[in-house]
Structures are given as C-alpha cells and as structure tokens.
Amino acid sequence: LLNRKYGITEEDFISAELSAVPAFNACDIGFDRSLIGSYGHDDRVCAYACLAAILQVKEPRHTCVCMLADKEEIGSEGVTGMKSAAFDTFMTDLCESQGVPLRVCYEKSFCLSADVTAAYDPNFADVYEKRNSAFVNYGMGLCKYTRARRVLDEANVVWQMAELGKVDAGGGGTVAAYMAQRDIDTLDAGVPVLSMHAPFETVGKLDCYMTFKGMKAVFESTK
C-alpha cells in the first residue's frame, strides 16, 4: 500500500524520519467556539504566531530574527536543535557583516523563547498550583519576564504569569536556558495548552491572538 500510494520502499525506512499522527482535522470547541482542538499545538501554535508576527514587521528599529528549532522534546539535540551551532553560525555571519562582535550582539539582544505552557486543568488539579498557573483564554502566558512587560502593556497585550506545574510534580522544559547561556536576556512565553502532549490538545483563541500580538510588539519595540 505504501509503495503503491506513495512510492515508498523498504530501503526508504533506513533513513526515513517518520511520525504517526492522528488523522482528524483541527476543530472549534465550545458553545462560543472560543477554543481550538487539534493534534500538535505544542509547539506549532507558537511557531505560527512567531512567523506570522515577523512577516508583518515592515521597518523594525532593531534586527529581528525568527529561529524555528526542532527536537526540543528530547533536549534540543541534533543539527536542527537549539543546542547546535546553527544559530551561532548564522549570528556570527550577521554580526561580521555589520562589524559587530558576536558577544556584544548577544549582550544587547532580547529573546522571546516561544513555547506553550500548561493551562490549569481542574480534572487534574493535584499537579497544579492554581494561583501560579495559566488559564485558558486569559492571555499570553509568561513564565518569566525581563524587560518585556512594559512593551506588552503598551501594545495592549493581555498576558498572565504562569508556572508549568506544582513543585516536585514534574514538568516540561523550553529552549530558554540555552539562549540564556549565550548571555541573552530571555523571556519564556507562549500559549497555555490543555492536555499537552495528548493526541488532542486544546488552546484558547484569545491566547493565540495575544501571543501573536505580543510577539509582534517585541519585534517592533524601539526600546
């Protein structure tokens, strides 16, 4: 069947990188259709918001870069992960063309590490700290903020502070640590997600829009 339909042979599996994913489409959820249910919101929803935002930036005061990295769930390993030299190589070429040392560029840069955060789920309240959790349709979730809060407020971005889960209850990670190791001020921010890593994840439409709006505000910031 695979050969007849797609031309795939046994040899292709030796070097293929395959993913088995649910076949259903994204859909609206709720009487008010305020939610989106789909496979793979983590982290396509933030990647889309970032790409859509940078494409709308016309004449930024500062150089804008959108880096879409892979393999975050297994520690950002490999040539497409954030641990690879790809980002540093690109930034070195960019800095050399401007006659600026790479380290100086990093010290004066700001990074928005766009990744989803866990939204409070009342069905599994024992693994959340309710007062420190993000809620669906309460805005863009910030895990830590540096100098971006004023930028978001000036752009009328609805945002909320959040943590991934209760202390000692486990949780996920992002690429923020790898950016901070480069001496770049880094903000961990993204869309709150219900049922993260499940075949059917849920996000709020308001959160998606505010994440896009927040990223656009950061790209267009004059500070």
Region locations from a protein language model:
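Acidic/histidine-rich catalytic neighborhood of metal-dependent amide-processing enzymes
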Residues: 48-135, 222-223
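Active-site-adjacent substrate-binding region
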Residues: 2-7, 11, 119-198
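Catalytic-loop motifs flanking and including active-site residues across diverse enzymes
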Residues: 42-49, 185, 207, 211
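Acidic, glycine-rich active-site loops and adjacent beta-strand->loop/helix elements
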Residues: 24-26, 68-75, 116-118, 165-169, ...
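A short glycine/serine-rich beta->alpha loop
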Residues: 31-41, 72-77
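Soluble metallo-hydrolase cores and metallopeptidase-like ectodomains found primarily
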Residues: 1-38, 56
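His/Asp/Glu-rich mid-to-C-terminal helical/loop segments that flank catalytic regions of hydrolases
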Residues: 54-68, 191-223
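Domain-scale recognition of functional cores that engage charged ligands
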Residues: 2, 15, 40-53, 99
